[in-house]
Amino acid sequence: MPEDYWSAKDYQRNASFVPKLTKDIVKRINLSSSDELLDLGCGDGVLTNELVSQCRRVVGIDASPDMIKAARELGLNAYVIPGEKLLDASEIPSESFDVVFSNAALHWIMRQPKNRPIVMKGVSRVLRTKGRFVAECGAFGNVSEVVGSIYSILLALGATKEQIDQANPWFFGSEDDYTRMLEEAGFHVEYVENISRPTLLNKDVREWLDTFAQHFYHAFPQWKDIIRETVYNALLVTDCRSDGKWFLQYRRLRFVAHKE
């Protein structure tokens, strides 16, 4: 089990915008009252809980024990299962769901190249024939100003690119990346797009980093404060409006595929 850097309280304080910006992808699930849905990377369960009334059964899984604790406190049926373990997870029977849904999670789950086909096969295993895989995640180019700043700072401080790559917790794939991976796992891709979605932060980019960039802090603890303050000062120019509101340049990859 990977180390758990997540805090449900911090997430709700600094990233409550995440479940609020899901209207478009939730529409594409096209849920019916008879559907059984698995939420892959359910986090604190806030969005998952909104889906409960729309279908027959909802189950959530996530790699973070703290997030699953928060999801269970909402009354959800949720398990600590990393995405790459779904293929063999005894808690989740094969062909037991009509829909696998994932929001803002695949760019974490798919970070390691070796895990990508395993995750896709796991999703296929738990879906019934013609079942749907509907997801939104960080796309190629997502928060590129943040990623570029972090790499530039750490390279200037003496870290190697290989060390930074090892610390980087994200995989922001392209439409072609996901189409290929889905098709190789036996899915038919009905829809895929990469869209721009500038996103208003709850506070400033430092709190965003504290929530989402913990992996860099833990890999380079001696430079945590430098990363935090230098990214803040650099992005004041590009991502902070004159009224003090911060917008990061999010790009989202959305897809709908079904198991053949």
Curated annotation (Swiss-Prot):
GO terms for biological process: methylation. GO terms for cellular component: cytosol; nucleus. It is found in: Cytoplasm; Nucleus. Keywords: Cytoplasm, Methyltransferase, Nucleus, Transferase. It holds the Pfam family Methyltransf_11. It comes from the Eukaryota. InterPro entries: Methyltransf_11, SAM-dependent_MTases_sf. One of its GO terms (molecular function) is methyltransferase activity. Its EC number is 2.1.1.-. Belongs to the methyltransferase superfamily. Probable methyltransferase. PANTHER family: TRANS-ACONITATE 2-METHYLTRANSFERASE, TRANS-ACONITATE 2-METHYLTRANSFERASE-RELATED. This is Uncharacterized methyltransferase C70.08c. It comes from Schizosaccharomyces pombe (strain 972 / ATCC 24843).
